[in-house]
Amino acid sequence: MQLLKASDIISHLQIDGIFPGGNAIPCTHLNNYMNIKEKQLMNTIADVQSSRDLRNLPINQVGIKDLRFPITLQTAEGIQSTVARLTMTVYLPAEQKGTHMSRFVALMEQHTEALDFAQLRRLTAEMVALLDSRAGKISVSFPFFRKKTAPVSGIRSLLDYDVSLTGEMKDGAYGHSMKVMIPVTSLCPCSKEISQYGAHNQRSHVTVSLTADAEVGIEEVIDYVEAQASCQLYGLLKRPDEKYVTEKAYENPKFVEDMVRDVATSLIADKRIKSFVVESENFESIHNHSAYAYIAYP
């Protein structure tokens, strides 16, 4: 690679009429020169993805997947910083060879606002316009943290939840959905009934996917699920807390079937929620397999 000396750069600037002469190069002049040269260079490079495709096959979704990006969230409990994985796609018409992949990342680099459902809608609309498409979809997945208070000692600690928000636009119509995975404790009613000394219990993952006519907060979904578990989980417990959660789970046994039915009943009662799926996976402590249940509504 040939490196230009300072005198060579000055000569180029003088030839292009950007800097008339002298030995010092002001930053503004150099920036102007580089911008002009960059545009000239781009005009000489073939734009292959904008060429015409002859196979007559549209692509439903094309874009980037698993872009890791720092974001801030606007939640009921304030602003929270986290790291998200994004999948950003648009519809590609049959006659167009390819989409402009760099524009997806460029769009994220321009946005510094805290993410909520309103911001997700704006971001999706901007993406569709920027890529000159009729439809597009953005999925944002991230760990969500909530400060929880231990039931006896009152000590506070963080617990993490997996959350995904999705915004989708097609021909001007927009819709969004949310998915939250909530870890809880479940205790087996049958084991309690037949055992003299206790009952087997385990950690369970309850996943709620929903669409709503009005915004439903992440914290609200978490509350719906934790209220129906044998017991909640906590990041940090002292011995009095451990005694409490053990006994609470024992007093509130739930089959995996009970878990999904009770959570579904709570969601149906919320008139903002239009449709949902509830799944529960119990990581059975006495088996090498999980118990699983699923309800879709309506």
UniProtKB/Swiss-Prot annotation:
Top enzyme category: hydrolase
One of the GO BP terms on file: tetrahydrofolate biosynthetic process
GO molecular function, one term: GTP cyclohydrolase I activity
Catalytic activity annotation: GTP + H2O = 7,8-dihydroneopterin 3'-triphosphate + formate + H(+)
Extent of the signal sequence: none
Listed transmembrane segments: none
EC number: 3.5.4.16
PANTHER family the record matches: GTP CYCLOHYDROLASE MPTA
NCBIfam families named among the record's database cross-references: PRK13674.1-1
Name this polypeptide is given: GTP cyclohydrolase FolE2
Organism: Neisseria meningitidis serogroup A / serotype 4A (strain DSM 15465 / Z2491)
